[in-house]
Amino acid sequence: SLFSLLNKVIHINNLESGIIRLMITRGDSNKTSPVFNMPCIYISIKPFYSIPIKPVKVVYLDETNYPIIRFTPAIKSMNYIGNMLSKRDCEKQGGYEPVFYNKDKIITECAIRNIFFIKDKVLYTPALELGILSGVMRETVLNIAESIDIEIKETYIYYDDINSMDEAFISSTGIGLLACYWDNWESKHHYTNLIKKELFKRIKNS
């Protein structure tokens, strides 16, 4: 069973805590036939890496410079080449995570994470119709914000407007929530820290 396979991988790698990824494809197929063989199963595992305590730097990049395809509705693709190339370029500029904007200069998402902004106690995050993934952590953050009376707006956020924001943070299952900053902009992250505190409380009690 899948559970026995996952447990075997955990046991072989001797990890008490970490991140495990399960991927199941439709199997091999030749180019001329719509018929697929037995599904292929891929399992990868890695230990939790050190998560920064202080706010991390993000770098805004034009996603049209990378081989990134957005689908509507979004899918979890296994092609990360564009994301990894952008991570490399981000790190060259001293950044932790790249944040993309599209051809219309609308913010979409990070290379492997979601981006959120706060202004006047309103939480802004890019709309799903832009072709971004609605991950587990993204939905959790929205739920937490709502529970502590922070208004939510899933909308178009223009690159030219980011410096007017009060706060910003990124999120993913692997890191939880990280406050962020960028060149010539920083924040005290008041509401960000409230959301993060509630997130840790939920994780601890789960």
Please place each PLM-identified region on the residue numbering.
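Short secondary-structure junctions
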Residues: 11-18
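Helix-start/capping segments and mature chain N-termini
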Residues: 2-11, 25, 32-206
